[in-house]
From Swiss-Prot:
Interacts with profilin and actin at the FH1 and FH2 domains respectively. This is Cell division control protein 12. Residues 1568-1577 have a biased composition (Basic residues). It comes from Schizosaccharomyces pombe (strain 972 / ATCC 24843). Keywords: Cell cycle, Cell division, Coiled coil, Nucleus, Phosphoprotein.
Length: 1841
């Protein structure tokens, strides 16, 4: 057998071929029998013989001994088949060997005429479609086709016996076959109908016992084949035989005749077993599964679909893809199964069908793919091209286009057979025309009809939609079809020319006759670059072929003979033709322009003459017609400006599109590189954003729906209300009382006015809630006008009256006219005059005074008329100068001309001002009128002569053109040789020779032409080397190199801008400027920080800098040419070079470029934050609106406020801003606010409102945001992204041709732009949702959402309320806790109250009491020696080191009176050092304590200097004792000290003597200081006693005896002072040591704010009185025990106090006895005065030790100590309390006398306790002594020593 497509030998054996593992090959039953006979079980039916489809000279070569010719008819075959079915034992019918049946020839192959599946004959293939292999020899015949079957020889080893028929009960097993016997699969061509084969059905159950193929669905659907096999054996033998015959003909089997004959001889049982055992072979998934994709189908499936014509368009596309991608084996199998013939059959069916099928375009595409894979099929299967040619007139454009492309490719192979088949195809197309037409007439006519339809469907040329429609898909498909068709025509012409055979007549003439020129003319109307190219190719080819084929004998002979040309020219020279020809040549040569332009001009004339000559020779037209046609053809070829412009636009658009495609490709590649996880994460994020947007939209929709429902209800209510009003009004009018009344009209008006007022209120409320701005501005103005009219009497005269005003109209250059008018003029005349004046003024105001160097082209018309109109406005004054005023104005330096009446632009600079009278002023307008009148007569005023022009440039020798110096040396050598004869130029510039050139008028001079001698001289110069010597001798020095070496770089940029560049690019200081430019152009990530700077106005708004750097610019829009080639940018400095290469060079799109980068960076940086903030604000608004607790709290506040307010201030609601006023409403004592009361109320009575702060946690976060700033930022980003999209689509960024070649802005922006736009859409939706939610929430709470301030403060007010409420709650809780703690402390103190006096009167203290009585008697009996002496106020000299600043003292206060200052006993230093209190910063921690306790910190083994010296006072010259004590603390700085003046106290009395010697004290300062304190003390005394101190010489620390108060006055003062609290003003000179009281009642805030060392006299630690009595030595141990007990009690009472361990005082310390002994009588008297009772009590609270000495009848105030104790017991006002044997005082009372109960208490703790109390006066000295005695803490006797 021979396969024609593969070129195999006819005797080729299939033993060596391995079949593909397809189901059909795998399921072939049994081995093949030896082929000894050539019998056939199914002869093929005949097919139409087409002469053009048969390959010439190939059928005779196929000869073989096995060739036999048979021809069968369908009728004969059917009769044989039917006869065989009736006889089961007979084999299949055999065809006689030499019988032939002739069938009439048909025009077309009709598939429906084929009777059965075997009706299609397959040619040129080695395999048949059904039954045995087909014969290969094809004999050409005009009427029939003789088929000679060829049977290949069978190998001797290939015979195997058939399997025995199996037993029905035993399953039949397949016999193993050798692989070499496997054959290639054979596919069946199923029947289209089942009408031919008879159906044998059972009469009983009517069951089908036939194998048949069922086609289901439409032709386009995927069909499945179902093979019906009966489950039981057919009852009839005929049915079984028929089923068996069909079974054998199935394509899965490939039996030869011997095998079929042996199978036919089997018994019916064996046949049925054979059928049942092999039925499993039909169960092929690739055939049976309908849902299986076509790409997974086998080759045979596609072939079956093609033959059945049931293949869909998608399956054809899949087949085309498989044909281009599968292996050669797959394609070979497709060809072996007659796939190409099936495609041809299907295409023929589509061409003949009246119904347009979408698969028609895919069939040629499959053919093209197959032919490209196997180019040999073009010659072996050339019959397919006839059907493809017919496809050129398909109703659809796409099949035409694909067919044209296929034929173009085939013609490129230059196969002659193809051209002849194409001719047959075109003839078939023309078969429908009765008369004879050109070959291509039918095809070209169809082509032309399509173009005309498209032309009619186009919009008019003037329509703006025409350009937009050109890019529609239909237009693109049409243009592609036209381009493919023209390409096919051009290829057809070229192929016919190269093959030199083909069509009988000339192809170009046939195309012309078919109307190709009309088609080309129509196609010219469609602007397409590719189509234009093909049209030009055709026209050029036609022109070339026409010229080459036309014989021009006369012309050729004429042009070839030069002598004839010259003779003809000589003949014409004398007549008119010669003159015109000479004139034409002269005009061409004299034409202006360069040589290239002259060449173009000559080409135009030459082409025109050639065209005219050619047309006159070729056509028989007249000369005029030929000339007109030539001109038309020539002008059509010229490109117009519009065409060129459109071409440029298209080129730019194409380039932009290409770059966008590249960018999209890169973006897709980047997405692919992301990987699955990143891509999924990105998509999930987008889905989440979309979900958020959808949820927000749902919320918004629900809100809008609610609002719409409310509006609908309101509308219905309003309609009902209106109806009610109308009915009421109707009833009112028709009522009897109304008709009888006289004031009925007034009643109606009153009723309507009431309703109107009510409606106004309702509308106002609704507008507040819903409208944007409340009342419209226009409506508000109208209301104001009506109110004014209603308030004033409105008359016509008042309405028409126009107030006096001055008409202010600015003139050019600050030239003002003030036009006034009176109110007495009528309205009409005033209107006319104002119109005239306005017109004139506007005309004059439109003038422009040009600046320096600007041409003036403004025309002023009728200035006099304008002046007249202005004058008429000015009440028609007699003269212009009386009323018109023109202000003088300054003329800038660059303004040098006033506009004048001119008809042509004046040359720059303009002439000076014609009417200028002085330096900076203009003349009166009258003079302007004079000038205008003169110019009206003269017509044109002569202009002033222009300034002299700049010096002209160099004039070149050739043509007298001006040549710049830089170009003067660049003249071509030819021009130079013509002028000077020199052909050589110097290598470098030489010194110039200055002479007077003679370049003209040399005709009759010596210089007319060079003589022979001159030529010799010139040759000598060239050869002798003189010119070389000139080069060396007269060479000029290169100034450029010297400038480079000596001069620095040119610097145009300002220093400030250079600093900015240096700051922003400091990280890149090590890089080259070109590298920085490259990084910026490549949009490097490291340059994002500089984007803001490079796009700022400081950088861009530099006009002077740009102008200076303009010569260095590179014009990238014109191909990157330098603007000025002489300028070298390398001369510039670093930042100037950077500026010119970026901002100046790319100035056309730099702003948009940087803006794009800025928008991108901002969106990438702030998008997430903005979305989060918008969501937060929306969520906060929803939480606030939905919070029931907060709304209940607001109602509670409303009810409380309405309860507090009067009736006028009652409210139904309040704004959120009112919450901020709650902390400002205080109670009567100003201690608590309404917010404190609200907290208490909520905690006691409304606990459900207590926990509203956590519900509003989001509101607290939203309060930190600025809503207005967020809205503005979001709007700017959205607007910026939209502008960026516009710039990339049609703006500055849409044309990449003007970009820098290295600029990658589009590659960065475009991939991101889609994502950025999507983000901005999301952000826009979030912003809209936020605004909607917030506005609804604000309206819900009664706020104004249109007020930006209210919107910004909405959440902040709520947050402020939450913070204030939390503070109030904390204050309440703290106050309650302190009250509870104080109550507990009071109970503890009250428990020990009764034990105080008992301990004082106990026997243990008897000796102490007696000693005290003796001590008091001694004091009273002291003789006052020097009281009569005048008090000397000499200065006290003290050292600065003894002055320390007392904290918290006032400058106006004086030391407390009635104080006895006692020096302290010394303590043990070691115990004190262990527990030292903390002191404020800036003061030494131990100074005050050491001084107070007489402790000096010393190093180990040293003795204190104070202990060595002893604390002894020395009597001063003045006789005054200044101080008896020293102060505890030095200067302590605290917050409470701010603003208070420091008071100075004496630090250590014992060191006064040494300090006086070292550094004298400023006595004058001290006197002023003491006098101020004293005056302050006197003022306080005078307020209480009504008496002023008379003795001003007494020290502030003592009290005069005259001022001692009585017992009753003290009692009344004490009671009255309990109601008032006055702050104490401490003295400047605090000479007391601090005292401590346990009964301090402190305010809670004072404890936190007061200093560690509180101000006041109570800070002084007062030591107990230690009398110098020797009897007390015995009781030292008892005193120590009492001291320890008191210390322990204090520890229990004040557990936080720091205890200082006590010890015996060292001998030598001074006590009160020593001081009294050493002092004079004056000091003793002062002691006695201080022991007097307390004079007055200024402060509230009960005196803790209010000792008041009883006055005896004799006037003396002496009493025993026991008497005073008895009175102390009886006094009810003395609330002495006993705490463990010591005296303490009630915390509810404010003590006047702070008494140190235990010296072991820490000084710091004393101050802490005292800081909680109200400052009061210090106690008396005697009271302090008594308190010390009562507490049992008497000093031991060692103090005296």
């Amino acid at each position: 057998m021979r396969n024609s497509s593969k070129g195999q030998d006819p005797n080729f054996s299939y033993d060596s071929i391995l079949s593909t593992p397809t189901p059909s090959a795998r399921r072939t039953i049994g081995p093949r029998a030896p082929k000894s006979k050539t019998t056939y079980h199914k002869p093929p039916s005949s097919i139409e013989s087409v002469s053009t489809l048969i390959q010439p000279n190939k059928s005779q070569s196929v000869t073989s001994p096995y060739v036999k010719q048979f021809t069968f008819s369908s009728k004969e075959y059917n009769s044989h088949n039917k006869h065989a079915l009736q006889n089961s034992q007979l084999p299949l019918p055999k065809t006689p060997e030499k019988s032939t049946v002739h069938r009439p020839k048909a025009n077309k192959v009709e598939v429906t005429d084929l009777p059965s599946s075997s009706s299609v004959e397959h040619l040129h293939t080695s395999k048949h479609l059904k039954g045995p292999r087909l014969p290969k020899n094809i004999i050409k015949s005009s009427e029939d086709v003789q088929i000679a079957p060829v049977t290949p020889p069978v190998h001797s080893r290939s015979f195997d016996p058939l399997p025995k028929p199996p037993v029905p009960s035993v399953p039949v097993s397949k016999t193993k076959r050798r692989t070499k016997h496997k054959l290639a699969p054979v596919v069946e061509v199923p029947e289209i109908t089942n009408e031919v084969s008879p159906k044998f059905t059972s009469t009983n159950d009517e069951q089908v016992y036939r194998l048949r193929s069922i086609r289901a669905g439409s032709p386009n659907s995927v069909c499945s084949f179902q093979f019906e096999i009966p489950s039981t054996r057919p009852p009839s033998l005929d049915q079984l035989i028929h089923l068996f015959n069909d079974f054998l003909r199935h394509p899965v089997f490939d039996f030869d005749e011997n095998a079929i004959e042996m199978l036919q001889s089997c018994t019916p049982d064996e046949k049925w077993c054979f059928i049942r055992s092999n039925f499993a072979g039909f169960d092929d998934p690739s055939f049976q599964i309908p849902e299986l994709a076509a790409v997974h189908r086998p080759v045979s499936w596609f072939v079956i679909q093609l033959w059945n014509k049931t293949i869909s368009n998608l399956q054809l596309i899949t087949l085309s893809s498989l044909l281009s991608t599968q292996s050669d084996r797959w394609i070979s199998l497709f060809l072996e199964l007659q796939g190409l013939r099936a495609l041809h059959n299907l295409l023929t069916y589509f061409n003949s069908s009246a119904v347009v099928q979408p698969q028609q375009a895919e069939v040629p595409r499959c053919m093209l793919t197959l032919l490209k894979k196997k180019p040999t099929l073009v010659t072996s299967n050339s019959y397919i091209f006839q059907a493809i040619t017919v496809t050129l007139i398909s109703p659809n454009l796409l099949p035409r286009k694909v067919a044209a492309d296929l034929l173009t490719w085939v013609l490129s192979l230059k196969e002659p057979l193809v051209v002849s088949i194409l001719e047959t195809g075109f003839k078939e197309i023309n078969a429908e025309y009765e008369k004879e037409v050109p070959l291509f007439f039918g095809w070209i006519k169809s082509f032309k009809d399509i173009i005309l339809e498209k032309e009619l469907a186009r919009t008019p040329p003037s329509s703006p939609a025409r350009n937009s429609a050109s890019s529609s898909p239909s237009n693109i498909a049409f243009l592609e079809y036209c381009t493919s068709t023209m390409e096919f025509i051009n290829q057809l012409i070229v192929a016919c020319e190269e093959l030199e055979q083909g069509f009988d007549l000339d192809i170009l003439d046939s195309l012309r006759e078919s109307g190709i020129h009309e088609v080309i003319q129509l196609l010219r109307n469609f602007p397409d670059q590719q189509l234009e190219k093909q049209l030009n190719i055709y026209e050029s080819e036609e022109e070339r072929r026409t010229i080459s084929q036309t014989t021009h004998e006369d012309v050729d002979s004429f042009m070839s003979n030069e002598s004839s040309i010259l003779s003809s020219f000589n003949e014409f020279a004398s007549n008119e033709v010669g003159r015109l020809l000479e004139s034409t040549i002269q005009n061409i040569l004299l034409a202006k322009g360069t040589e290239k332009q002259k060449v173009k001009l000559i080409k135009v004339f030459n082409s025109l003459l050639q065209r005219i000559l050619l047309n006159s020779k070729v056509s028989n037209e007249s000369f005029e017609d030929s000339l007109q046609a030539s001109l038309n053809m020539l002008t059509e070829r010229f490109y117009s400006d519009d065409t060129a412009r459109n071409a440029l636009k298209e080129a730019k658009a194409s380039r932009a599109m290409a770059e966008k495609m590249v960018i999209e490709r890169d973006a897709m590649a980047a997405q692919v590189n992301l990987g699955a996880e990143d891509l999924i994460a990105k998509l999930n994020k987008e889905v989440e954003d979309q979900k958020d947007v959808i949820l927000s939209q749902k919320r918004t929709n629900e809100t809008l729906k609610t609002e719409i429902d409310a509006l609908q209800k309101s509308h219905v209510t309003q309609i009902q209300r209106s109806e009610v009003e109308l009915r009421e009004l109707y009833l009112l009018i028709n009522s009897d009382s109304f008709q009888g009344s006289t004031n009925s009209k007034e009643r109606i008006i009153e009723y309507l006015l009431d309703k109107l007022d009510l409606r106004k209120k309702e509308i106002a409320a609704e507008s507040t809630l819903w409208s944007n701005d409340g009342i419209d501005d226009k409506l508000r103005d109208l209301r104001e006008q009506m109110s004014r009219q209603s308030s004033q009497p409105s008359t016509v005269s008042t309405i028409l009256q126009i107030p006096d005003k001055k008409f202010h109209r600015p003139f050019p250059r600050h030239l003002h006219r003030y036009v006034g008018r009176s109110a007495s003029e009528s309205l009409t005349s005033e209107k006319d005059e104002s119109i005239k004046s306005m017109k004139g003024i506007d005309d004059f105001a439109n003038l422009e005074i040009p600046g320096k160097g600007i041409e003036s082209n403004v025309v002023i018309k009728d200035i006099s008329n304008q002046t007249h109109e202005i004058n008429s406005v000015e009440n028609k004054a007699e003269t212009v100068s009386n009323n018109s005023k023109i202000t003088n104005f300054d003329i800038p330096n660059d303004a040098t001309s006033l506009p004048t009446i001119i008809t042509h632009p004046t040359p720059p600079p303009p002439p000076p001002l014609p009417v200028k009278t002085s330096l900076n002023t203009f003349s009166h307008p009258d003079s302007v009128n004079i000038v205008a009148n003169d110019t009206s007569v003269a017509g044109v005023m002569p202009a002033f002569p222009p300034p002299p022009p700049p010096p002209p440039p160099l004039v070149s020798a050739a043509g007298g053109k001006f040549v710049s110096p830089a170009v003067s040396n660049n003249i071509s050598k030819d021009d130079l040789h013509k002028t000077t004869g020199l052909t050589r130029r110097p290598t470098r510039r030489l010194k110039q020779m200055h002479w007077e050139k003679l370049n003209s008028g040399l005709e009759f001079t010596f210089w007319t032409g060079p003589s022979d001698e001159a030529n010799k001289i010139l040759e000598t110069l060239h050869t002798s080397g003189v010119l070389d010597e000139l080069d060396e001798s007269f060479a000029m020095k290169e100034a450029k190199t010297l400038v480079k070496k000596t001069c620095a770089r040119t610097d145009y940029m300002s220093s400030e801008l250079q600093k900015l560049f240096g700051i922003h690019f400091h990280k890149l200081s090590h890089k080259n400027p070109n590298e920085i430019i490259r990084m910026i152009l490549h949009c490097d990530d490291s340059m994002n920080e500089c984007v803001e700077f490079l796009s700022s106005d400081k950088v861009l708004n530099q006009p002077k800098l740009k102008a200076d750097l303009e010569p260095y610019r590179i014009d990238w829009a014109n191909g990157g040419d330098l603007v000025n080639s002489e300028k070298d940018a390398s001369e510039l400095s670093r930042w100037d070079y950077l500026y010119v290469r970026l901002i100046v060079d790319l100035g056309g799109y730099w702003n948009q470029r940087m803006n794009a980068l800025k928008v991108k960076n901002i969106i990438e940086t702030n998008y997430e934050n903005l979305v989060r903030q918008t969501k937060l604000i929306g969520r906060a608004a929803l939480e606030l609106r939905d919070s029931k607790v907060f709304k209940g709290l607001l109602y509670l506040i409303l009810y409380l406020g309405n309860y507090m307010n009067d009736y006028v201030r009652q409210a139904k609601g309040f704004a959120i801003g009112s919450l901020q006023r709650l902390p400002l409403i205080k109670n009567a004592n100003n201690t608590k606010s309404l917010l404190h009361i609200l907290d208490i109320t909520i905690r006691k009575h409304f606990p459900q409102f207590d926990n509203f702060s956590p519900e509003l946690s989001t509101v607290t976060e939203a309060a930190k945001l600025n809503i207005e700033a967020i809205e503005q930022e979001c709007s700017e980003l959205i607007r910026g992204c939209q502008n960026l999209q516009i710039d990339c689509d049609s703006g500055a960024l849409s044309d990449p041709t003007v970009f820098h070649p290295d600029d990658k802005i589009l590659s960065v922006i475009l991939p991101w732009l889609m994502e950025g736009t999507k983000k901005m859409d999301f952000l826009k939706e979030h912003l809209r949702t936020m605004n909607t939610t917030l506005n609804n929430a604000m309206r819900y709470f009664g706020e104004q959402p249109n007020d930006p301030n209210s919107k910004n403060l909405f959440f902040k007010r709520v947050d402020s309320f939450i913070i204030d409420y939390s503070k109030a709650r904390s204050d309440n809780l703290k106050s309650e806790e302190e009250e509870a703690s104080q109550h507990r402390r009071l109970n503890l103190v009250n428990n020990h109250k009764e034990h105080v006096l008992e301990r004082a009167m106990s026997e243990n203290n008897k000796m102490d009491n007696e000693a005290m009585d003796g001590f008091l008697d001694k004091l009273r009996n002291v003789k006052l020696e020097s009281h009569h002496k005048p008090r000397n106020r000499s200065a006290i000299t003290m050292g600065k080191e003894h002055l320390i600043e007392a904290p918290n003292t006032s400058t106006k206060s004086s030391p407390a009176k009635n104080e006895l200052f006692v020096p302290k006993r010394s303590s043990v230093k070691s115990d004190l050092a262990k527990v030292r209190p903390r002191y404020p910063k800036g003061s030494e921690s131990t100074d005050g304590l050491s001084d107070a306790l007489n402790i000096t910190p010393t190093k180990k083994g040293e003795v204190s200097s104070k202990a060595k010296k002893g604390y002894n006072y020395e009597k001063r010259r003045s006789g005054r004792q200044v101080s008896d004590s020293y102060v505890l603390n030095k200067n302590s700085k605290n917050k409470s000290n701010k603003g208070r003046s420091a008071s100075y106290t004496f630090s250590d009395p014992s060191s006064l003597e040494d300090s006086n010697r070292q550094k004298p004290f400023n006595g004058e300062k001290f006197r002023r200081f003491s006098s101020k304190s004293r005056r302050g003390s006197q003022n306080r005394d005078s307020k209480k006693t009504g008496k002023a101190r008379k003795d001003k010489g007494i020290n502030n620390n003592q009290t005069s005896p005259q001022n001692k108060p009585s017992k009753e006055s003290l009692k009344s003062d004490t009671i009255s002072n309990e109601k008032k609290v006055f702050p104490q003003k401490a003295s400047k000179v605090n000479l007391l040591t601090p005292t401590i009281s346990n009964g301090t009642r402190a305010s809670k805030h004072a404890n936190e704010k007061e200093n560690t060392f509180p101000r006041g006299v109570e800070n002084n630690l007062v030591a107990p009185m230690i009398p110098n009595n020797t009897e007390l030595n015995e009781d030292t141990s008892a005193v120590s025990r009492n001291l320890e007990n008191a210390t322990n009690d204090l520890k229990e009472t004040f557990p936080t106090t720091t205890t200082i361990s006590t010890a015996r005082a060292k001998p030598g310390n001074n006590d009160i006895n020593t001081i009294l002994r050493r002092n004079n009588s004056r000091g003793r008297r002062r002691m006695l005065q201080q022991m007097s009772p307390l004079k007055s009590n200024k402060f509230s609270g009960t005196n803790d030790l209010n000792f008041q000495q009883a006055t005896k009848p004799d006037g003396s105030n002496k009493s025993s100590y026991m008497e005073r104790l008895e009175k102390l017991k009886q006094n009810s006002e003395r609330h002495l309390q006993s705490v463990g044997g010591k005296k303490v005082y009630s915390s509810e009372e404010t003590p006047v006398n702070k008494i140190l109960v235990s010296p072991s208490v820490s000084i710091l703790d004393h101050n802490r306790i005292l800081s909680q109390s109200t400052p009061i006066k210090s106690p008396q000295r005697a009271q302090e002594m008594l308190a010390g005695l009562l507490s049992g803490k008497l000093a031991p006797k060692e103090n005296e020593k």
